């Protein structure tokens, strides 16, 4: 695609029918903002030549895409789609574009192949738009044709049969291709003389026809995937379709997915051929599951990495965690951001880790909290052990040396270090460093007293 063609996403609206405080384009599908699916569909065609018009709660959209190479244009007042184009015009011109494809930010089912097709079909047009024929056109803008040629697009609420004739079933999808040189003279002529009091991008069509420009309405059959998401029911429908599309893609790519109808996978997740997933299971964000890894049912992963030969057992929760090769996690384990398991490390049931590392072969079998900790190779953490890392104001680190053995029900009060090969007796409260190859016991002495006879 030539570098003079770009894309504009309209994402400034409130989406009141979603009954939510956040912008409609931030409603989540498979753990991702709806807007991301639109951006992902456009990126292979336009690269970084994609702008997004934001308005309502723009701050939330900025935060959702912080750190990413996204370009935004602000529409302070939401005065319609035509006004949104006017707000973006200077940016589009400054980028040296000849053509721009305009899409709505609430079309998560939009496919890259559809955009490719549309660009080829509209190559010679001054203005082109995609249309569908629906048995029930609903609230979508109607396409008016005279002798097969496009005459205008009329919003449903403004349609008057006395002016335009019998109401057609062909509707506008809201996807446009505009030649900037042709449209530039038309933009200032948009008015808000309609029932909504808004400036419609659709009015450019009628203006262009009046100027005898080349206007095309490109028909795409009855594909509902081109339509926007306007309410919770449509959001759930779109999510179901995308979930199926993504899961089938992974299966066809060589991933073994059991009960695939119960598995949810983010479009940003990477699952290598030869990995095995048991449903129900949820894999979100930039998670990566390597070849030969197994994730069992009822697990939840976000931005987690699981290397080959590792097994994540049922009911485990991993977020921002890294699981090395040949590891075992769970069942019922929780690995929070910054948790790292090196090769052949093991974490059992009801173990929680946060900003903690288990080096090669280290084990924490059950009922343990490891926070802000470094556990050396081959060390063993007994049941009920906790690192007391927070003093009410600051966090402190615990270091456990290679080959150390921490007895059950031990409290390690950070900052503290247990040296290599040391043994900590069960039930100890360790407040001072333990030298290498030492035995540390810090608990009250047991006293046995005879019971008094019952009266």
From Swiss-Prot:
GO biological process: cell morphogenesis; cell wall organization; lipid A biosynthetic process; peptidoglycan biosynthetic process; regulation of cell shape; UDP-N-acetylglucosamine biosynthetic process
Molecular function, one GO term: UDP-N-acetylglucosamine diphosphorylase activity
InterPro entries reported for this sequence: Bifunctional_GlmU, GlmU-like, GlmU_C_LbH, Hexapep, Hexapep_transf_CS, MobA-like_NTP_Trfase, Nucleotide-diphossugar_trans, Trimer_LpxA-like_sf
Record's protein name: Bifunctional protein GlmU
Protein location: Cytoplasm
Region N-acetyltransferase, annotated ranges: 254-455
Keywords: Acyltransferase, Cell shape, Cell wall biogenesis/degradation, Cytoplasm, Magnesium, Metal-binding, Multifunctional enzyme, Nucleotidyltransferase, Peptidoglycan synthesis, Repeat, Transferase
Pathway field: Nucleotide-sugar biosynthesis; UDP-N-acetyl-alpha-D-glucosamine biosynthesis; N-acetyl-alpha-D-glucosamine 1-phosphate from alpha-D-glucosamine 6-phosphate (route II): step 2/2; Nucleotide-sugar biosynthesis; UDP-N-acetyl-alpha-D-glucosamine biosynthesis; UDP-N-acetyl-alpha-D-glucosamine from N-acetyl-alpha-D-glucosamine 1-phosphate: step 1/1; Bacterial outer membrane biogenesis; LPS lipid A biosynthesis
Disulfide bonds: none
Co-factor remark: Binds 1 Mg(2+) ion per subunit.
Region (Pyrophosphorylase): 1-232
Gene Ontology terms: cellular component: cytoplasm; membrane
Major localization class: cytoplasm
Binding site for UDP-N-acetyl-alpha-D-glucosamine: 10-13, 24, 75, 80-81, 141, 155, 172, 230, 336, 354, 369, 380
Species of origin: Nitratidesulfovibrio vulgaris (strain ATCC 29579 / DSM 644 / CCUG 34227 / NCIMB 8303 / VKM B-1760 / Hildenborough) (Desulfovibrio vulgaris)
């Amino acid at each position: 695609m030539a570098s003079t063609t770009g894309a504009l996403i309209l994402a400034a609206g409130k989406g009141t029918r979603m009954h939510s405080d956040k912008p409609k384009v931030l409603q989540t599908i498979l753990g991702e903002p709806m807007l991301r699916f639109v951006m992902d569909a456009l990126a292979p065609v336009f690269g970084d030549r994609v702008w997004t018009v934001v308005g309502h709660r723009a701050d939330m959209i900025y935060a959702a895409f912080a750190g990413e190479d996204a370009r935004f244009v602000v529409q302070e007042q939401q005065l319609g789609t035509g006004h949104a184009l006017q707000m973006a015009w200077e940016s589009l011109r400054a980028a040296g574009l000849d053509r721009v494809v305009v899409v709505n930010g609430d079309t998560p089912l939009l496919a890259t192949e559809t955009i490719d097709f549309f660009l080829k079909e509209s190559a010679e047009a001054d203005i082109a738009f995609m249309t569908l024929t629906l048995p029930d056109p609903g609230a979508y803008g109607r396409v008016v044709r005279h002798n097969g040629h496009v005459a205008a697009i009329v919003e449903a609420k403004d349609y008057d049969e006395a002016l335009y004739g019998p109401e057609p079933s062909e509707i506008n999808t809201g996807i446009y291709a505009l030649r900037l040189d042709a449209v530039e003279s038309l933009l200032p002529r948009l008015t808000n003389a309609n029932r909504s009091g808004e400036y419609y991008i659709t009015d450019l069509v009628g203006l262009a026809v009046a100027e005898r420009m080349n206007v095309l309405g490109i028909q795409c059959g009855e594909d509902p995937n081109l339509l926007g998401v306007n309410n919770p029911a449509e959001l759930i429908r779109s999510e179901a379709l995308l979930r199926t599309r993504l899961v089938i893609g992974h299966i066809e790519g060589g991933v073994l997915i059991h009960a695939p109808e119960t598995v949810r996978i983010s479009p940003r997740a990477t699952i290598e051929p030869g990995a095995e997933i048991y449903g129900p299971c949820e894999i979100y964000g930039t998670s990566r599951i390597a070849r030969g890894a197994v994730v069992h049912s009822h697990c939840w992963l976000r931005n987690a990495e699981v290397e080959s030969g590792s097994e994540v057992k049922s009911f485990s929760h991993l977020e921002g965690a890294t699981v090395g090769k040949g590891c075992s996690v769970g069942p019922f384990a929780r690995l929070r951001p910054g948790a790292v398991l090196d090769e052949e490390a093991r974490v059992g049931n009801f173990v929680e880790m946060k900003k903690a590392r288990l080096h090669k072969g280290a084990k924490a079998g059950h009922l343990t909290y490891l926070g802000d900790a470094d556990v050396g190779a081959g060390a063993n953490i007994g049941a009920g052990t906790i690192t007391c890392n927070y003093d009410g104001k600051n966090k402190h680190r615990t270091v456990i040396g290679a080959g150390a053995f921490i007895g059950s029900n031990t409290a390690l009060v950070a900052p503290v270090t247990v040296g290599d090969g040391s043994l900590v007796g069960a039930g100890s409260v360790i407040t001072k460093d333990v030298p290498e190859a030492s035995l540390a016991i810090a608990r009250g002495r047991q006293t046995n007293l005879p019971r008094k006879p019952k009266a």
